[in-house]
Amino acid sequence: MYSAKPYDRRSFDAANVEGRHGEPIEIQYHEARLNRSTVGYAAGVDVVCAFVNDDLSADVLELLAASGTTCVALRCAGFNNVDLDAAARLGITVVRVPAYSPNAVAEHTLALMLTLNRKIHRAHNRVRDRNFSLDGLVGFDMAGKTAAVIGTGQIGAIVARLLWHLRCDVVAFDPVVKQGLVDLGVTYVELDDALAAADIVTLNCPLNEHTHHLIDEASIATMKPGAMLVNTGRGALIDTAAVLEALKSVHIGSLALDVYEEEGDLFFEDRSDEILDDDNFARLLTYPN
């Protein structure tokens, strides 16, 4: 297992006990990420367990196949870091998590919206500094606002239902229309129409060649001035440079990111004692909205 954290060890060790799923299997844990320099750790193993920031390009897969690996098990839903054509050519089976807890991600998405709207993060910091002023902490009623859900898969569908229960007017964009959402009152529209109508935009779609930089300068121009944007999908759904300019001009009124386009060198590590050399990320951290 590459990119192994203490919580990974605890979860896998708890599940890897005799009698639960047959005989226990031998698991080798490595904190290092999988790449050409670390692929040797997997010499002779049948299965490699990888995470979102591990390198599963053709070069790495060829080295894995040469050393006897026949399966790559992703402990994530996304697979854009895997060269699937190379895996098929090499006879390596690739499996993934079909979905994280859809409810957990959907609830987190809603929590980010409420945090932005009600300025909960700012209020928390003020109270710790014994500043009990309410100035600048006023939000808006989400009831009656238009929310655009971009992607209505397992997670997006739950987000749409949660927003409907908050009495938002929910519009959605997805190539596949879910009749259950339509019956609830969700209206499916084209992407530009969804962005133009929405006070709140949430991205819950996969990353592929069609959705890369889905939110860019052109699509931002179609959005309502002051709209809220939340991304709990994939980092590269957003053109970070374009979003930064929109934040600066307040065309995007507020932004919540659970993912980031260049997160591979940042996330899942303690960077508190380091200088961030990613200028876009550093700029994002300076904005109050």
Region locations from a protein language model:
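Rossmann-like dinucleotide-binding domain for NAD(H)/NADP(H)
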Residues: G226, G233-N289
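An N-terminal-biased, well-structured beta-alpha scaffold segment characteristic
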Residues: M1-V94, D216
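A short helix->loop->beta-strand "cap" motif at the edges of active sites that frequently abuts
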Residues: A66-C71, L90-I92, R167-C168, P225-A227, ...
